[in-house]
Curated annotation (Swiss-Prot):
Lineage: Bacteria, Pseudomonadati, Pseudomonadota, Gammaproteobacteria, Enterobacterales
Alphabetical list of InterPro entries matching this protein: A-crystallin/Hsp20_dom, ACD_IbpA/B, HSP20-like_chaperone, HSP20_IbpB
Subunit structure: Homodimer. Forms homomultimers of about 100-150 subunits at optimal growth temperatures. Conformation changes to oligomers at high temperatures or high ionic concentrations. The decrease in size of the multimers is accompanied by an increase in chaperone activity.
Localization in the cell: Cytoplasm
Alphabetical list of HAMAP family matching this protein: HSP20_IbpB (MF_02001)
SUPFAM superfamilies with a match to the protein in the record: HSP20-like chaperones (SSF49764)
Organism, as annotated: Citrobacter koseri (strain ATCC BAA-895 / CDC 4225-83 / SGSC4696)
Protein name: Small heat shock protein IbpB
Main location, first listed in the record: cytoplasm
Gene Ontology cellular-component annotations: cytoplasm
Keywords, ordered alphabetically: Chaperone, Cytoplasm, Stress response
Amino acid sequence: MRNYDLSPLLRQWIGFDKLANALQNTGESQSFPPYNIEKSDDNHYRITLALAGFRQEDLDIQLEGTRLTVKGTPAQPEKEIKWLHQGLVTQPFSLSFTLAENMEVSGATFTNGLLHIDLTRNEPETIAPQRIAISERPALNS
């Protein structure tokens, strides 16, 4: 029997918490750049990417439908560097997240090498649950 680790896929589905919690395995895989996904409440999320060595102008964020894509292309150094040890990775990357319906990007900030992307779920009133008042008289005349 084969076991498939879906956790890398599920971590990138923002707003599908019940599905992710039901299917997520304990296995974790690494990707570049490292990132966190925070949930403040049922309607507010934040994606934080660690981007040491990148500048704001090296980054591009695009939302196409429900696909949020973050791309980074670091500037090339003016002169070639001879490394004795290179522990910081500054390579081009493209990272995509699938957002649930009605999720919107409410803002993005880049501070101290961390890119924060804030997300908000905006449910239209037609989808939001409606409370129905119960009257004391029967609805149909009998």
